[in-house]
A protein has these predicted regions:
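Intrinsically disordered, low-complexity terminal regions
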Residues: 1-264
Length: 264
């Protein structure tokens, strides 16, 4: 009997998770204000994800052109358009967008300001604005744009550019920016304190800040099997902004690294 009650409770919880999914492909997900950033995970394949903030506690997920309001044909309306699936996990929400005829629709999220994000897509862009939390974003074929974000950022793109502007940094957590074929363009507040690790294999490094560079130097290795002592060259540049602070790593193979100072 207890087992049946538990299963019934789980079903009720799942049903209550999504308050409403209207004809425009819009899902409202109630969340509680626990005093800690909410965590949202999204994994897409052929779609882009856009995240904006609002003052409420709900998470709103939208896909364009979905639902029974699709265009009519011969007096009939299509009702099998792709939808949004939400799974509540221990550390937050996992949001997915269904495939239809081999295609996946772009996803737009409206979230509370204090939200942590884990966003991944293979063929698509990632665009986030105004979020304060832990932001971890990855795209294979697309660009990453993070505007007026705060907290910590781990961002990577294989075939795209990174453009990031940060209002505040979490001094206790490192930052990482990487791209194989694209520029890395990051704007920090003028009073940022950071220790930098910089590497642009086939590009240039530019900065508005006065960066105190430290020697790259040689890193000692070990004896090989034939008795030769191997020395590994560290090709990274190391430096500090405003005396050093949060650890920030930048790496691009075919692109530039640009570090801007935000205007006051």
């Amino acid at each position: 009997m207890k087992r049946y009650l538990a299963l019934a409770g789980m079903l009720l919880a799942v049903c209550a998770l999504a308050r409403a999914q209207d004809s425009a492909g819009r899902l409202v997900i109630p969340t509680r204000d626990t005093g800690t950033p909410r965590a949202i995970s999204v994994s897409l394949v052929h779609a882009s994800v856009t995240v904006r903030t609002h003052s409420g506690n709900d998470v709103i997920a939208e896909t364009p052109g979905a639902g029974p309001s699709s265009a009519e044909r011969d007096g009939m309306r299509r009702i099998d358009a792709p939808g949004i699936a939400v799974e509540r996990q221990d550390n937050g929400l996992r949001i997915q967008v269904a495939f239809h005829n081999g295609h996946q629709r772009d996803l737009t999220l409206t979230v509370p300001v204090g939200t942590s994000l884990n966003l991944k897509t293979i063929h698509g862009d990632i665009d986030v604005e105004g979020v304060h939390g832990e932001i971890d974003v990855t795209t294979l074929h697309g660009n990453v744009t993070l505007t007026a974000v705060s907290g910590t950022v781990v961002a990577s793109s294989t075939m795209g550019t990174l453009k990031v502007s940060m209002d505040r940094l979490d001094p206790a957590k490192p930052l990482s920016f990487s791209s194989l074929n694209g520029n890395i363009d990051v704007t920090f507040p003028p009073d940022v304190k950071a220790n930098l690790k910089l590497k642009a294999d086939r590009g240039e490094i530019w900065s508005d800040f006065a960066i105190s560079l430290s020697g790259a130097g040689l890193q000692s290795g070990s004896h090989t099997t034939n008795g030769v002592y191997r020395i590994n060259l560290d090709r990274n540049l190391y430096g500090a902004i405003n005396g050093g602070g949060v650890e920030a790593s930048f790496h691009t193979v075919n692109g530039k690294i640009l570090i801007h100072k935000r205007s006051k």
